[in-house]
Amino acid sequence: MIKDIFSIYNWDVVILYECTCDDIDYIIKALKEIKCPNKFIKEALDNLETCNLNIGLTYSNIALKSSIIIINKTSSFAQLINTISHEYYHLICHISRIFKIKDEEELAYLNGNLNMRSYKIVESLKREVDS
């Protein structure tokens, strides 16, 4: 598992890449730390315990301005990009809702900043998936 922890828009973000079944305890603990409701934790656990590839989850605690994004191992680099894009969209929606960001250009910059932030990690994962 690769961890990336940062703040953007005064919002704390933890992204866990390349998660497997071995990481479930850590993931559940991280979700509990940001006061994730038990209902979502159960749903996350049900998904993660399948040990399937290509699973992504995002949980945001709006009050804490904090999010956790989980990206399981993927079957291909294309699927990795798809999963990351999908989960980033959830994060962008959560941030934009709280900060009332409606300007498309500002949202596009937020998306770009997230992608630039993750570029080196994604690039290293591309080499791993391609080999």
Functional labels for PLM-detected ranges:
Residues 31-78:
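Active-site scaffold of zinc-dependent metalloenzymes
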Residues 91, 95-99, 122:
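Amphipathic alpha-helical interaction segments
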Residues 1-49:
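Non-catalytic terminal regions of proteins
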Residues 101-131:
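Post-HExxH zinc-binding segment in Zn-dependent metallohydrolases
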Residues 71-74, 94, 112:
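Short His-Asn-centered micro-motif
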Residues 78-79, 83, 102-106:
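Short, conserved micro-motifs enriched in small and acidic residues
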Residues 62-64, 85, 127-131:
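Disordered, low-complexity tails and leader-like regions
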